[in-house]
Swiss-Prot record:
Keywords: Cytoplasm, FAD, Flavoprotein, NAD, tRNA processing. This is tRNA uridine 5-carboxymethylaminomethyl modification enzyme MnmG. NAD(+) binds at residues 273-287. The keyword NAD applies. InterPro entries: FAD/NAD-bd_sf, GIDA_C_N, MnmG, MnmG-rel, MnmG-rel_CS, MnmG_C, MnmG_C_subdom, MnmG_C_subdom_sf. It holds the Pfam family GIDA. GO terms for biological process: tRNA methylation; tRNA wobble uridine modification. GO terms for molecular function: flavin adenine dinucleotide binding. Its main location: cytoplasm. FAD binds at residues 13-18.
């Protein structure tokens, strides 16, 4: 063994969590080492070829607002962009993009290679190095020590990973890559709570064997959306469609007859899978009355021959997979070029983490991504960014940062994980956020970019553009308030004729925009509108802020009330056994979870309002004692 180098931060794993962690820490000026089994797999889209979706896109926008790279990577590699829930309110509208897998990986690789303070090496980590209950480095399989002030573990499905196809299984981190067995064994020797989860993927189909005739076509939206606040439609490669087909009774019968060959239904596979992304076997068993299920045929790239049949994730034997595929319209003669499979892997109880994603048990050790019990690229990447920036702050002996639930979807994600934990892969949805009208996609930069700048994550060009956008929005909103329309003006006649609006008194453009049938583009057709702005992103924010001003104000007032509990800290309480009046169940949960505030304590299952009242009384008494 020999001492090769010293670093501020070491990141283990280079998937979506690891790459964002490494970028965040290096952008903050920390000397960072990113270790991966294969540099050729940096930021690989291991499963579905898509970024975004309901709730997930909000995380991508927040990563971007904090200077992360996921939004930029998908803008340069996305081959189909759509806005989901476009007919619904702005709180739940979500961008989703199909990715060219090769272009996405190449973009991530290019961004990482340009980053200062970052060294990327191929090496498998087999152990952590400790000193006085703190992590101080890692040991690789080839017996090299790397030392650091903090370590981020972002190993994805590689820790104890086991692939299942039918009743056969073998160790692997994903198909074609070996599992990190030694590190898994070592981590299980520590005082960390470990369990198993599983996820799955469908077979890949040769695009040349698919009959797309008579299938429903899905093109990109017009205008084509962008993800990054620094992005532009011109960054997108060529746009191509996806197609929709369905399973049928024949498909379902094939699956029912072969459930005895499923590792899930024969007990070979113990880990719980994602509730909201079930295998086709699960769908057939859980919804026996359904006559069909959607299958989206998603190309994996402009030059790839692989099609991803989204909706038929399976771990049945390959010969059964072939029967399933052949039973589906358009796929009757299709050829499988890679089988579907399930993968079981280690995850660590996220309740053992602080809100900064640092272990409560081992100083300097941070966890990010699927090993925290989440599923999805976006959930992993956002955790990676948070873990990376906090690993950087920790290496500088600086207090960590995390967003609150009212500040970001990332705040919701982290609070849910560390407060409630999870027994199945956790996926983000807009429904998980109680303040979702304030946490829209379009205002992620307004919520987080200033914070990112203070942390050292946001560069000068992004900061200049952000400030110009804020100025444009404020200037235009003020102009709309001052710009009036008279009931005797030609514009009043236009409003009556086109929108059935009968003005009886002077009205501002801002008041007019509050009406549900009026959009900003409608105002532009009025003579008194004069010159507005052309930034579609800013226009969207202006519309939302004006149209939903009343709701946003009420939500802001609610947030203010809740902040009182979030800012009432419990750090002075070391042992809840000493507080009289708490039940033994409540004491055990509080001692186990160690919530940082009254707000977090109130979200722990089983912590009653009465228990919260006792805690508040205790804090008040302690505060009074200190004033004497």
């Amino acid at each position: 063994m020999f001492n090769l180098r010293n670093f501020d931060v070491i990141v283990v794993g280079a998937g979506h969590a690891g790459t964002e962690a490494a970028m965040a820490s290096s952008r903050m000026g920390c000397k960072t080492l990113l270790l991966t089994q294969k540099i050729s797999d940096l930021g690989a889209l291991s499963c579905n070829p898509a970024i975004g979706g309901i709730g997930k896109s909000h995380l991508v926008k927040e990563i971007d607002a904090l200077g992360g790279m996921m939004a930029k990577a998908i803008d340069y590699s996305g081959i189909q962009f759509r806005i989901l829930n476009s007919s619904k309110g702005p709180a739940v509208r979500s961008t989703r993009a199909q990715a060219d897998k090769i272009l996405y990986h190449e973009t991530v690789k290019k961004i990482l290679k340009k980053q200062n303070n970052l060294l990327i090496l191929e090496a498998e980590v087999k152990d952590l190095i400790f000193k006085n209950y703190s992590v101080v480095g890692v040991l690789t399989q080839n017996e090299i020590n790397f030392y650091s002030r903090s370590v981020v573990l972002a190993a994805g499905t590689f820790l104890g990973g086991k692939i299942h196809i039918g009743l056969k299984s073998y160790s692997a981190g994903r198909i074609g890559d070996k599992s990190a067995i030694d590190l898994s064994v070592r981590l299980r020797e520590l005082s960390l709570r470990v369990n198993r989860l599983k996820t799955g993927t469908p077979p890949r189909i040769d695009i040349n064997t698919v009959n797309f005739n008579n299938l429903l076509i899905q093109n990109s939206d017009t205008p084509v959306p962008v993800f990054s606040f620094m992005g532009n439609v011109s960054h997108h490669p060529k746009q191509i469609p996806c197609y929709l087909t369905h399973t049928n009774e024949k498909t379902h019968e094939i699956i029912r007859k072969n459930l005895d060959k499923s590792p899930i239904y024969t007990g070979f596979l113990k880990g719980l899978g994602p509730r909201y992304c079930p295998s086709i076997e699960d769908k057939i068993v859980r919804f026996p009355d359904r006559k069909s299920h959607q299958v989206f045929l998603e190309p994996e790239g402009l030059s790839s021959i692989k099609v991803y049949p989204n909706g038929i994730s399976t771990s049945l034997p390959i010969e059964v997979q072939e029967q399933i595929v052949a039973s589906i319209k358009g796929l009757e003669k299709s050829k499988i070029i890679r089988p579907g499979y399930a993968i079981e892997y280690d995850f660590f109880d996220p309740k053992d983490l602080n809100l900064t994603l640092e272990s409560k048990l081992i100083k300097g050790l941070f966890f990010a991504g699927q090993i925290n019990g989440t599923t999805g690229y976006e959930e992993a990447a956002s955790q990676g960014l948070l873990a990376g920036l906090n690993a950087a702050l920790s290496s500088k002996n600086t207090e960590g940062w995390f967003p609150r639930r009212d500040q970001a979807y990332l705040g919701v994600l982290i609070d849910d994980l560390t407060t409630q934990g999870t027994e199945e892969p956790y996926r983000m949805f807009t429904s998980r956020a109680e303040y979702r009208l304030s946490l829209r996609e379009d205002n992620a930069d307004l919520r987080l970019t200033e914070i990112g700048r203070k942390l050292g994550l946001v560069n000068d060009s992004r900061w200049i553009r952000y400030n110009q956008k804020v100025l444009n929005i404020q200037t235009e909103m003020n102009r709309l308030k001052k710009n009036k329309i008279s009931p005797i003006s030609p514009d009043a006649d236009i409003l009556k004729k086109l929108y059935n609006i009968n003005l009886i008194k002077e009205i501002s453009m801002s008041e007019l925009l509050k009406r549900p049938q009026i959009r900003y583009q409608d105002l532009q057709s009025l003579e008194s509108f004069r010159t507005g702005i052309v930034d579609l992103e800013a226009i969207g924010q202006i519309e939302n802020e004006i149209k939903y001003a009343g709701y946003i104000k009420r939500q802001s007032e609610e947030i203010e009330r809740h902040l009182k509990n979030e800012n009432t800290f419990l750090s002075s309480i070391y042992d809840y056994n000493k507080i009289r009046g708490l039940s033994s169940e409540v004491v055990k949960k509080l001692n186990d979870y160690k919530p940082i505030s009254i707000g977090q304590a109130s979200r722990i299952s089983g912590i009653t309002p009465a228990a919260i009242s006792i805690l508040l009384i205790h804090l008040k008494k302690e505060s009074y004692k200190h004033t004497l």
